[in-house]
């Protein structure tokens, strides 16, 4: 028996079937480095329009987790797709370097005995070490960027730039010193930003406390009574007994009704709506003898339960009726609403009682409780209230309460002297900051769109921004305050520039070692040099100033404004937020044009990632087992607008999808063996109809993908590429062309037409996947035929695709109908294989009973219909002639019948044909194969 294998154009490529990504990816990284890929991109992009994605800096502490990987991969996919779309898209990675976590790490490692200077020195060393580790991990993910020159908030230039940004805000009148309640952590010994606060359940002791009336006549008049018949008190309810020693007022709602309730021994003032529940809680009987509008009780004085001072009634809209008594006890030093209300009633800072120190211990001079830690003092306070007859009720509840995100310990509001950026303070020119920021939000694009309402709500309701911290490792607030007046030096902005110049040379240490006389001369004795440092959110929030127009000037045609900020949804209250405020304060616009928010990673059951649950996914482990491209494919396949599920099983599914895409690429490459585009590429008009359709379909898909990429809809990109590989290519086109590719003459029009289409598809596909499968795309690029540059990323979207001309007889709609018919035939062929009627599809002969229009369409292909259906014979018969055993299909106007061929099998093309053996020199093959071997070769027109 003759072996005809050598006469076939069998596929051949060195592109490996097995990806081996964990081993191959590091080699590709080395190649990118050796060719200077990032620098080459900057060179070829210098005259292109710019697209700047500004990197939100991760904190320089610890190994990267799956959230970091997700974030950096999303950014890289955008930068790569923008590059392919013709933009110069630089990517400068950054790191957030100052702040408490690093200072805390240094203290834990080296002890708390360190001097401030030594602490800063060790913090700088630690941050640098952490950055190197994280940098290696980010590069391993395939993230293209300026890794040799990243920005770091601890770089001297950036520290100096931050001081200059603060000076701009001082100059415009946004910065002030004030006493205000701020989120305070006893363990940090510092104020916390809103973004550093998290909520967790806490058990608290609630108390109902009676404050005896001090002005009985005024209270009686408020209730429309001539006098009070017995002692009276107003009752408050609180979950913070420790604040009672700092009570200075009582807040009620002006529009609620309040009742005077006779309980026998005394009269109680309670919100009318809550009388019944309160009396039940106190185990008392009582009756309402009078009611009054809350506004009538304004400025009625009551007495503190155990201190000799008054507590006046103030009106406040924030009082609620959900729980308690409808009366809120006010300790202005320890509650933001209380503080605002007391200030509205004329209380000055010196009047506000602040008995709790920075470590949570009452000052020694506080009567009864001096020297006690506030949480431990609660029982003593309750006991004192009981002793004086003021305690109405106490119980323990569990409720959501603010905690430090680092120490996981409860926080308090604590009024301290701090530096603030005023939200509603009138600047020297223009609108207040809140107004500016809200306008800027309207001018910003949000992806997803709901982010706009979320950020708007946060800005609309936020308090002034406390920007000062009492720590060592941070950018200093370089102010000099007059010792007598407490006022800033009149030349503050000028002095800040002098400090910035020193910091540019020596880092933040320059301020801390500075002798005031060096800048102030003879005035030095009149001023205090302050040692507060800036909130780390000010560090990262001003990168648009000290990075984009400073250390890494972007040279954007429209100024130092990023096109895109991209971070997790928590950054609406973090980096997006602080950047918006500083941008609007300095430049009167947001520092970004568009904000993209991604969700958090969860496991496949929707649970948060947690080491205790054992459901964390470590990027390093994925890189070393499956490869970074699998992680990148998972990111692209997942809708980032909500929670993003990831697990070993989910990543395995991504690996399966990857194999399908890789196998498609390998098929394309292997069938381009011997193809030289410079020599063999056919013009569109010389190609077969099916091949022209395949190129046209590729062009249409490319247009869709470009749009999805521009809208950052990567899951649509992934699904469409995957479906194209599996369905339109694998399930239709590539199956059909195998016969023509393998059996026709090596240099025949039929084969070169097919290879031309495969070449165009390959050139397009390798670019489509480049933003997602960064390593694999560049690997494929090395195996494509024809002259090419060193990396797929040095190119744009493929421009060699052609559209089917209008009026083409076998147009898109035609091939859609053919695909539907082929799907129906495939279904019946599978049934016949299952029933053992046929062994393989080529053993089948199919008769199509079609209505007139469909019959005419299918008949256009003539004998080539069998190649489309991949059967040994196919005939089209009028629908009316369908026998009873013809199978109905889902295609309207189509029935079909499959029978097993009775002919011999061709030993070369494997078709079962009547003419097998008709040529005496080749008794084992069909006449078509004989013609392809020794004759002029078969001619194909369509498929």
UniProtKB/Swiss-Prot annotation:
EC primary class: ligase
Molecular-function annotations in GO: aminoacyl-tRNA deacylase activity; ATP binding; isoleucine-tRNA ligase activity; tRNA binding; zinc ion binding
Binding site for L-isoleucyl-5'-AMP: 567
Binding, ATP: 611
Pfam family, one: zf-FPG_IleRS
UniProt comment concerning the protein's domains: IleRS has two distinct active sites: one for aminoacylation and one for editing. The misactivated valine is translocated from the active site to the editing site, which sterically excludes the correctly activated isoleucine. The single editing site contains two valyl binding pockets, one specific for each substrate (Val-AMP or Val-tRNA(Ile)).
Chain's role: Catalyzes the attachment of isoleucine to tRNA(Ile). As IleRS can inadvertently accommodate and process structurally similar amino acids such as valine, to avoid such errors it has two additional distinct tRNA(Ile)-dependent editing activities. One activity is designated as 'pretransfer' editing and involves the hydrolysis of activated Val-AMP. The other activity is designated 'posttransfer' editing and involves deacylation of mischarged Val-tRNA(Ile).
Family: Belongs to the class-I aminoacyl-tRNA synthetase family. IleS type 1 subfamily.
PANTHER family reported for this sequence: ISOLEUCINE--TRNA LIGASE, MITOCHONDRIAL, SOLEUCYL-TRNA SYNTHETASE
Protein name (record): Isoleucine--tRNA ligase
Encoding gene per record: ileS
């Amino acid at each position: 028996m003759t072996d005809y294998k050598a006469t076939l154009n069998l596929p051949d490529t060195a592109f490996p079937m097995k990806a081996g990504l964990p081993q191959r990816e590091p080699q590709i990284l080395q190649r990118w480095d050796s060719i200077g890929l990032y620098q080459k991109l900057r060179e070829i992009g210098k005259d292109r329009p710019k697209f700047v994605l500004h990197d939100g800096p991760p904190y320089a502490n610890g190994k990267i987790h799956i959230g970091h990987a997700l974030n950096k991969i999303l950014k890289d996919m955008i930068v790569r797709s923008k590059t392919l779309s013709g933009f110069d898209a630089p990517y400068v990675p950054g790191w957030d370097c100052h702040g408490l976590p690093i200072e805390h790490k240094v203290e834990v490692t080296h002890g708390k005995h360190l001097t401030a200077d030594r602490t800063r020195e060790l913090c700088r060393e630690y941050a640098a070490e952490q950055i190197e580790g994280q940098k290696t991990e980010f590069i391993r993910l395939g993230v293209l960027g300026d890794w040799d020159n990243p920005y770091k908030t601890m770089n001297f230039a950036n520290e100096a730039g931050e001081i200059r940004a603060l000076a701009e805000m001082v100059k415009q009148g946004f910065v002030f010193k004030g006493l205000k309640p701020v989120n305070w952590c006893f363990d940090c010994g510092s104020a916390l930003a809103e973004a550093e606060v998290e909520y967790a359940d806490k058990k608290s002791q609630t108390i109902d406390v009676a404050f005896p009336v001090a002005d009985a006549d005024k209270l009686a008049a408020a209730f429309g009574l001539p006098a009070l018949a017995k002692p009276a008190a107003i009752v408050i309810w609180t979950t913070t007994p420790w604040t009672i020693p700092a009570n200075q007022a009582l807040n009620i709602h002006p529009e609620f009704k309040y009742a005077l309730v006779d309980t026998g021994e005394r009269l109680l003032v309670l919100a009318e709506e809550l009388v019944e529940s309160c009396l039940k809680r106190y185990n008392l009987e009582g009756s309402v003898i009078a009611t009054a509008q809350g506004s009538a009780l304004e400025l009625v004085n009551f007495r503190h339960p155990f201190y000799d001072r008054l507590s006046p009634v103030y009106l406040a809209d924030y009082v609620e009726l959900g729980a308690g008594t409808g009366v809120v006890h006010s300790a202005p030093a320890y509650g933001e609403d209380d503080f605002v209300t007391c200030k509205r009633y004329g209380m000055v800072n010196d009047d506000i009682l602040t008995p709790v120190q920075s470590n949570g211990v009452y000052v020694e001079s506080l009567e009864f409780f001096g020297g006690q830690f506030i949480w431990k003092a609660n029982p003593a306070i309750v006991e004192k209230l009981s002793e004086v007859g003021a305690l109405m009720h106490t119980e323990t509840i569990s409720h959501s309460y603010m905690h430090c995100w680092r120490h996981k310990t409860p926080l308090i509001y604590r009024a301290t002297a701090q530096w603030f950026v005023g939200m509603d303070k009138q600047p020297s020119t223009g609108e207040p900051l809140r107004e500016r920021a809200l306008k800027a939000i309207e001018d910003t694009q949000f992806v997803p769109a709901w982010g706009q309402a979320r950020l708007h709500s946060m800005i609309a309701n936020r308090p002034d921004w406390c920007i000062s911290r009492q720590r060592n490792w941070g950018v200093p607030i370089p102010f000099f305050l007059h010792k007598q007046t407490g006022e800033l030096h009149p030349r503050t902005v000028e002095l800040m520039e002098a400090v910035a110049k020193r910091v540019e040379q020596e880092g933040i240490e320059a301020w801390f070692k500075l002798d005031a006389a060096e800048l102030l001369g003879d005035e030095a004795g009149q001023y205090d040099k302050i040692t507060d440092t800036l909130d780390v959110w000010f560090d990262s929030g001003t990168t648009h100033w000290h990075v984009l127009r400073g250390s890494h000037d972007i040279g954007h045609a429209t100024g130092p404004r990023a096109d895109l900020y991209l971070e997790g949804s928590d950054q609406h209250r973090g980096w997006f937020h602080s950047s918006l405020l500083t941008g609007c304060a300095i430049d009167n616009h947001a520092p970004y044009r568009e904000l993209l928010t991604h969700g958090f990673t969860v496991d496949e059951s929707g649970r948060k990632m947690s080491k205790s649950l054992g459901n964390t996914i470590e990027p390093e482990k994925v890189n070393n087992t499956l490869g970074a491209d699998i992680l990148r494919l998972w990111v692209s396949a997942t809708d980032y607008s909500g929670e993003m599920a990831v697990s070993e099983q989910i990543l395995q599914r991504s690996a399966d999808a990857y194999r399908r895409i890789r196998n498609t690429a390998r098929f394309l490459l292997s069938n381009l063996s011997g193809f030289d585009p410079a020599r063999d590429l056919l013009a569109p008009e010389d190609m077969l109809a099916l091949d022209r359709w395949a190129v046209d379909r590729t062009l249409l898909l490319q247009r869709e993908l470009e749009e999805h990429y521009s809208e950052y809809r990567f899951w649509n990109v992934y699904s469409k590429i995957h479906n194209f590989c599996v369905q339109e290519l694998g399930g239709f086109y590539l199956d059909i062309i195998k016969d023509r590719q393998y059996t026709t003459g090596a240099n025949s029009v039929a084969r070169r037409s097919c290879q031309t289409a495969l070449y165009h598809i390959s050139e397009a596909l390798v670019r489509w996947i480049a933003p997602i499968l960064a390593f694999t795309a560049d690997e494929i690029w090395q195996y494509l035929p024809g002259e090419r540059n060193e990396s797929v990323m040095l190119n744009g979207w493929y421009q060699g695709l052609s559209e089917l001309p209008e009026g083409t007889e076998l147009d898109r709609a035609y091939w859609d109908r053919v695909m539907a018919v082929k799907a129906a035939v495939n279904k019946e062929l599978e049934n016949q294989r299952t029933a053992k009627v046929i062994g393989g599809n080529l053993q089948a002969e199919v008769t199509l009973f079609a209505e007139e229009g469909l019959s005419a369409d299918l008949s256009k292909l003539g004998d080539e219909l069998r190649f489309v259906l991949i059967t040994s014979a196919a005939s089209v018969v009028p629908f009316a002639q369908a026998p009873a055993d013809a199978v109905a299909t889902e295609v309207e106007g189509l029935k079909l019948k499959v029978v097993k061929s009775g002919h011999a099998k061709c030993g070369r093309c494997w078709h079962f044909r009547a003419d097998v053996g008709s040529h005496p020199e080749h008794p084992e093959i069909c006449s078509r194969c004989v013609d392809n071997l020794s004759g002029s070769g078969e001619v194909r027109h369509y498929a």
